A protein has these predicted regions:
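Conserved GNAT-family N-acetyltransferase fold
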Residues: 46, 66, 90
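Conserved short histidine dyad/triad with adjacent acidic residue
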Residues: 29, 44-59
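Glycine- and acidic-residue-biased ligand/ion/polar-headgroup-sensing regions
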Residues: 61-63, 68-73
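Short acidic-glycine-tyrosine-enriched beta hairpin
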Residues: 79-94
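Histidine-centered metal-chelating micro-motifs
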Residues: 53-55, 74, 90, 94-100
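Ligand-binding loop in jelly-roll beta-barrel domains
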Residues: 94-120
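A short, N-terminal "cap"/entry segment at the start of jelly-roll beta-barrel domains
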Residues: 1-41, 55, 125-127
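A generic "binding-loop/recognition-motif" signal
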Residues: 50, 61-62, 80, 96-97, ...
């Protein structure tokens, strides 16, 4: 650490509290301006229960990357549907309507990276 400025933040998932996001998924915010030195993006873990989905939505300002850690799902972006699973990275441009379903029998767990960082106000619900 130099002076009063923090140079590094390490946040362990176990220290974060889950909350239900505007799209209906359970979120754990891992890194964002609210809890770290990060200013221009955010990283969160999302969990979607078997047989459920997020609600279709879009972000006027933010682009997103989903990275699937566990489970099986179906991703919809602007009407296109694709099956997704572990180790798949999904690019979601700003303004693109999107939704993800858990099509498996275990929780669908993914990382969500938003740039600029996630804000509830930048989420517009379609459904």
């Amino acid at each position: 650490m130099t002076g009063l400025k923090r140079d590094m933040d390490i946040i362990n998932r176990a220290t974060t509290k889950p909350f239900i996001c505007k799209d209906g998924s359970e979120i754990r915010e891992l890194l964002a301006y609210r809890n770290s030195v990060i200013r221009n993006q955010s990283l969160a873990e999302a969990t979607i229960a078997p047989g459920t989905s997020t609600q279709e939505h879009y972000h006027p300002k933010s682009e997103e990357i989903y990275y699937i850690l566990r489970g099986a799902g179906r991703m919809k972006i602007e009407g296109e549907l694709r099956d997704v699973g572990p180790l798949d990275a999904i690019a979601i441009p700003p303004g693109a309507r999107h939704k993800i379903w858990n099509t498996g029998t275990v929780p669908l767990i993914l990382l969500c990276c938003c740039a600029p960082g996630y804000e509830n106000e930048d989420t517009v619900m379609v459904e």
